Regions:
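Hydrophobic helix-and-loop "lid/oligomerization" segment in the mid-to-C-terminal part
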Residues: 1-50, 70-71, 88-91, 97, ...
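Active-site cavity-forming subdomains of large catalytic enzyme subunits
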Residues: 44-115, 119, 123-132, 142, ...
Length: 334
């Protein structure tokens, strides 16, 4: 949800500012997570000179280096943790050598609030950009529903700035005229006048998520961008059906994972589900964590490797612990 919403915020806003812009949504299984060399080369071959990442890129040091070697301009917008290595002098942070890196979790970043999701990073970038162009922020504020949607679904802390965004975003959804978002609300049979954070986090969000999990997130992006009601209704119905399918797969996988977890008393549970669809590993990990109150990593078979996703508890910094054994992984982030 966060990636789709941040991509949509950037796409819609940059287009409004007159940029020639398109959105590429990596296929979760074929392309993996985030930007990669194949996508960069494809963009370069098509004559594209600038790449702007959203909700990813902070861990893409080599990929950014490759884009720069081709003479491309690359801007990273992300909210994930900055990778680092431990040295005798302390932590050495590994920041991609992009033309600009916008991430409030950088050590030297003075932005006061550190719990933004990717869509809010995109929203703040566009807000600053329109201000520098001397353009009214009215159009930017119309994007608050998407920032609110991502904020709730990415489960960031609902404090300070995030609480305000969700509060005002919910109010704006009730009066939203966007065809795509309204089509999804209708497909889910939600009364717009009574919409709240539950509907965002447990009804609308999962439908957007299901697109990227079982098909391609491009379908969700197409829905949000659609201006034709008939086409939007078809896309929304398709996303709703995908989510229903995802629910059934998740229930089955969760049952298997809990059965496996019963046989182990480890402080951190690592569960291998051979036939699990890799896109729902994180959801299953979250369900097992809730049941066992332990950090959980769910692994499954992927092309040429084993792939997984983890969910932790408040007392355990999973990303920090993974960094201690990073040589065991081909790639990871958080």
């Amino acid at each position: 949800v966060d990636g789709v919403c941040s991509g949509y915020i950037l796409y819609r806003s940059l287009k409004k500012l007159g940029a020639v812009v398109d959105v590429v949504v990596p296929h979760r299984i074929e392309d993996g997570y985030g930007i990669n060399e194949n996508l960069i080369k494809k963009a370069f071959d098509q004559g594209i000179d600038t790449i702007l990442t959203c909700d990813n890129g902070i861990a893409a040091y080599n990929q950014v280096e490759y884009a720069k070697s081709l003479g491309m301009t690359i801007i990273v917008t992300d909210h994930h943790e900055v990778p680092y290595t431990e040295t005798e002098q302390g932590r050495e942070y590994i920041i991609p050598k992009a033309d600009a890196v916008i991430n409030h979790k950088q050590k030297d970043c003075g932005y006061p609030f550190k719990e933004l999701c990717g869509a809010m990073v995109a929203f703040q970038l566009i807000s600053a950009l329109t201000e520098s162009y001397g353009i009214s922020k009215r159009d930017v504020y119309r994007l608050l529903p998407y920032a609110a949607l991502a904020t709730v679904c990415d489960v960031v802390e609902l404090q300070g700035e995030n609480r305000m965004v969700v509060q005002y975003g919910l109010k704006m959804i009730k009066n939203c005229k966007d065809v795509g978002l309204n089509a999804l609300i209708d497909a889910c049979k939600i009364d717009k006048n009574n919409i709240d954070s539950y509907h965002i986090g447990f009804v609308l969000g999962p439908c957007i998520n299901a697109s990227g999990r079982l098909d391609t997130a491009k379908k969700a992006m197409e829905l949000l961008s659609e201006t034709n009601k008939e086409k939007a209704d078809i896309l929304a119905t398709s996303l709703k059906e995908l989510n229903d399918e995802r629910k059934a797969m998740t229930e089955e996988g969760t049952k298997k994972a809990i059965e496996i977890a019963k046989d182990y008393d480890d402080n951190v549970l690592v569960i291998y589900l051979k036939d699990c669809h890799e896109s729902i590993a994180g959801i299953i990990a979250g369900r097992v964590r809730e049941r066992c109150n332990k950090p959980v990593i769910v692994l499954t078979d992927a092309k040429d490797c084993v792939k997984g996703s983890g969910r932790s508890i408040e007392e355990y910094d999973m990303y920090e612990e993974l960094c201690k054994v990073k040589d065991l992984f081909l790639k990871f982030g958080g």
